[in-house]
UniProtKB/Swiss-Prot annotation:
SMART domains: UBCc. The chain crosses the membrane at residues 214-234. One of its GO terms (molecular function) is ATP binding. Accepts the ubiquitin from the E1 complex and catalyzes its covalent attachment to other proteins. This is Ubiquitin-conjugating enzyme E2 34. It is found in: Membrane. InterPro entries: Ub_conjugating_enzyme, UBQ-conjugat_E2_core, UBQ-conjugating_enzyme/RWD. The keyword Cell inner membrane does not apply. Residues 180-204 have a biased composition (Basic and acidic residues). PROSITE patterns: UBC_2. Signal peptide: none annotated.
């Protein structure tokens, strides 16, 4: 059972977050348990996590703010193990370094900053930049399969749906291009083939004409000359 001081503190922090949201961070308490908070970290531009949306949970002890919370991440990210507590100076891994003045926003800001780092810690993993980028690209789709995420962060679900519609529209616009290109190629081939056929046909026609007899006027001339030659002896008589 959470202490009254803990409940009042968390309610106050939630109101502060709603009034002054933290850049790249969204956090909300569970409707049924104010000790369990759900968060989304947005990957910073210029990092392998750019475009990623990383969902996780913060579990506060009833003694908060005098004791630190436990922090886990649900979304595969390439930096931290999923469903495993992350070792931070602001988490229950290090109660000796905890400061009661720290808040939910400062915890998540610190987590986001540490996520961009490469320092190893308990609960961290070592992956390539390409792997982190791949996970960032698929993060929103992964999150939208989680019922708690869909319930607590409807704006991100809407964002995912809009992305899907945009991708479908792009696919529909680009798909007809391939048949058109094929048709153009076929038409081009058709244009070339008749020309080739005409060329071959013309060559055959010329050969055929060459094989035909002499023109008619030449034949008539030859017949006339032949007739005159044959008539010469008769004229001498």
């Amino acid at each position: 059972m959470a202490e009254k001081a803990c409940i009042k503190r968390l309610q106050k922090e939630y109101r502060a977050l709603c009034k002054e949201p933290v850049s790249h961070v969204v956090a909300r308490p569970s409707p049924n348990d104010i000790l369990e908070w759900h968060y989304v970290l947005e990957g910073s531009e210029g990092t392998p996590f750019a475009g990623g949306f990383y969902y996780g949970k913060i579990k506060f002890p009833p003694e908060y703010p005098y004791k630190p919370p436990g922090i886990t991440m649900t979304t595969p990210n390439g930096r931290f193990m999923t469903q495993k507590k992350i070792c931070l100076s602001m988490s229950d891994f290090h109660p000796e370094s905890w400061n009661p003045m720290w808040s939910v926003s400062s915890i998540l800001t610190g987590l986001l900053s540490f996520m961009m780092d490469t320092s190893p810690t308990t609960g961290s993993v070592n992956t390539t930049v390409i792997e982190k980028q791949r996970l960032a690209k698929s993060s929103l789709a992964f999150n939208c399969k989680t019922p708690a995420f869909r319930k607590l962060f409807p704006e991100y679900v809407e964002k995912y749906n809009q992305q899907q519609l945009a991708e479908q529209a792009t696919t529909q616009l680009t798909t007809p291009e391939s048949p058109q290109k094929s048709d153009t190629k076929v038409e081009s081939e058709k244009t070339i083939d008749p020309t080739k056929g005409d060329s071959e046909g013309g060559l055959k026609e010329r050969k055929k004409n060459n094989k035909q007899g002499l023109p008619a006027w030449i034949i008539l001339l030859l017949v006339s000359v032949f007739g005159v030659v044959m008539a010469l002896p008769l004229l001498q008589l």
